[in-house]
Amino acid sequence: LRGVYLADQKNHIDHHTIIEHEDEHCTSNELYKGILSGKSTAVFNGRIHVHKAAQKTDAIQSNQNLLLSDDAIIHTKPELEIYADDVKCTHGATIGRLDEKGIFYLRARGIKKEEAQKMMMRAYIGEVLNGMKNSKAKETLLEKIIENIPEGE
């Protein structure tokens, strides 16, 4: 399960997901990434529910966010609800800003600041699309996302 969300101005975005593992040897990999700017707000509330019969389940849940302004807000709550005792499950959330050292590195090589930021955001979002087998569709989708990335401060 993969997702990308972009919010700017005063947009509000809510994501609520539930993944149910009910039988043995289940697997899931949930990755949601967001880019927020302006006074936008986003909510990620994801739950992985591993039932007692779902032994040997392998589940990963991650919510990662870039804040491009001081006024953008993210509320993130990844959850694991596990009733089996032989599982491998992880969850986590990150909230951060663009890597200033990375931007400096690119600018030192003659790339304009805005282009350096877009390159870094493209790489950031690209991870979400990595599982797509159709490379043309993947590139088209990535370009559409890049066109709609909100402007930072």
List where the protein language model places each region.
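Short, conserved phosphate-binding/catalytic loop or strand-edge motifs used
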Residues: 122
